[in-house]
Curated annotation (Swiss-Prot):
Oligomeric form and interacting partners: Component of the TIM23 complex, at least composed of TIM23, TIM17, TIM50 and TIM21. Interacts with preproteins in transit.
Encoding gene, per UniProt annotation: TIM50
Transit peptide range per the UniProt entry: 1-16
SUPFAM superfamilies named in the record: HAD-like
Mitochondrial intermembrane side: 126-469
Lineage: superkingdom: Eukaryota
SMART domains in the cross-refs: CPDc (SM00577)
Bilayer disposition of the protein: Single-pass membrane protein
Pfam families: NIF
Major site of localization recorded for this protein: mitochondrion
Protein name, entry field: Mitochondrial import inner membrane translocase subunit TIM50
């Protein structure tokens, strides 16, 4: 600002120099003073800038507390000047302190101990098998004992792989309890998937998540429960699917057991449902699923069907004749029968064709009582009454199955409240188990539950006797 005013004053005086010489002489002292003032101001600022040098905010006390040794300020200034003059701009190496040396010593000790423990661990993991049981559990039947590099590496890989089986193997070796005695046992075991076969879940912005039952689901479960031990095996976690299974069978009358994702085997990025862990005879086990990967270990026991997308259909009802026929035949192994169908996904249509051929052959063999005269048929023809065809054994089985289903539904409706009350009593009885007792003694087993049920039955019988008196 001051410089601009002085320049303006000089220009105005020089412009009027030729016109007013007397004025020039009068103003020149003022000009000289202003110029001297300006030059003195600039000199003062330059000297102050030279005197003021940048100072570090880190003093000696702060550096000492941080663990850095004192550095001579003269050496520091000289080094900074040398760095400024050099074009390479190398960074000055910081002097190592006692704490730095201590850290390096501890790090070297840690690396050395880690190396020693690592070598010892590898040697221990590659040792000979402790027992035949361990060899079987590690799936190392083909790996013998010995200390050759190949055998040691194979045992090491088997043992290291077993450390991660917690995340890939099922929670238990036997997913189901032992089967009941023969007189109380159903002929076959039916393993069905839950999602996209029995139910379908859908999400939209208006309603959120909604889950729908497939048409004919209640009849499918109720009718086949008299022939099969039904096991629902879901690919989702128990926390998501457990409530859904309870909604499908609130009285626990149709579904014998429910398994979830925790019971699956994870291998090569696939969720596999291993039927060999069900504690059941594979020759009498049938699995229906919508994913081929789920049946990767036992494809001969499985029927892979198409996913249900939520549209109305009658597929569950159409599956009943084949499954009923399979359960009512005196077969020891269902796998040859299942593998006799070329396309298992279209097993309903192929079974219907076989049934029609069998029915035609039955009519030929038993039509008109093999050509023998029958008075009843003759009178019926005279009266115009249609002659009834002889029933196939399969028709008789279906009539008997339908009658049994109706009786069971009637019994279930009459005693539904009793079932719910008994279930609530069991929950109250075993709900008193504390966490300490659960950890120390474990969960109640089947025998304890049976004892409680027997005790409840005796109490109810005593109450009924007292009521009659």
């Amino acid at each position: 600002m001051f410089r601009t005013q002085s320049r303006y004053l000089v220009r105005s005086i020089l412009a009027n120099h030729c016109v007013l010489p007397s004025t020039r002489m009068a103003v020149s002292p003022i000009l000289n003073q202003s110029i001297k003032f300006y030059s003195s101001k600039d000199n003062a600022t330059d000297k102050s800038q030279e005197k003021e040098q940048p100072k570090s905010i880190l003093n000696d006390d702060m550096l000492a507390r941080a663990g850095f040794e004192d550095v001579d300020p003269k050496e520091e200034t000289s080094n900074s000047e040398e760095q400024a003059t050099k074009q390479t701009g190398r960074k000055r190496k910081r002097a190592q302190t006692s704490k730095d040396l201590q850290r390096e010593r501890y790090a070297n000790m840690f690396y050395l101990s880690a190396l020693i423990f690592g070598v010892a661990g590898v040697g221990y993991m590659s040792r000979d098998w402790d027992s035949e049981k361990e060899q079987e559990e590690m799936d190392g039947k083909n790996v013998e004992n010995g200390y050759t590099p190949k055998l040691m590496y194979e045992r090491l890989s088997k043992r290291l792989g077993s450390l991660f089986t917690f995340f890939s193997e099922p929670a238990f070796e036997n997913l189901l309890p032992p089967p009941p005695p023969e007189q109380y046992r159903r002929p076959l075991t039916l393993v069905v998937t839950l999602d996209d076969f029995l139910i379908h879940s859908n999400w939209d912005t208006q309603h959120g998540w909604r889950t729908g039952k497939r048409p004919g689901l209640d009849y499918f479960l109720g009718y086949l429960s008299q022939y099969y031990e039904i096991v629902v095996f879901s690919s989702n976690s128990q926390i998501y699917s457990d409530k859904t299974v309870n909604k499908l069978d609130p009285y626990h009358a149709y579904i014998s057991y429910a398994l979830f994702r925790e019971a699956c085997r994870y291998k090569d990025g696939k969720l596999i449902k291993d039927l060999s862990l069900l504690n059941r005879d594979l020759g009498k086990t049938v699995m229906i699923d919508v994913d081929e990967d789920s049946a990767a270990l036992q494809p001969e026991n499985s029927i892979i069907v198409k996913k249900w997308e939520g549209q109305p259909d009658e597929y569950l009802i159409s599956l009943i004749p084949f499954l009923e026929y399979l359960a009512t035949q005196p077969v020891k192994d269902v796998r040859p029968i299942l593998n006799s169908y070329k396309d298992k996904s279209n097993i309903v249509a192929e079974f219907a064709e076989r049934e029609n051929k069998l029915r035609e052959q039955w009519r030929k063999d038993h039509g008109g009582n093999n050509g023998k005269p029958n008075a009843g048929n003759f009178i019926a023809k005279l009266l115009g009454i249609p002659v009834p065809e002889p029933k196939m054994p399969l028709d008789i089985i279906r009539e008997h199955g339908q009658l049994q289903y109706e009786h069971f539904q009637k019994y279930l409706q009459e005693n539904a409240h009793k079932f719910l009350e008994e279930e609530q009593k069991l929950k109250d009885e075993f709900g008193k188990v504390t966490l300490n007792k659960l950890i120390t003694e474990g969960a109640p087993n089947a025998e304890e539950i049976a004892k409680v049920q027997q005790q409840r039955a005796l109490e109810e019988a005593q109450k009924q006797q007292e009521g009659h008196k």
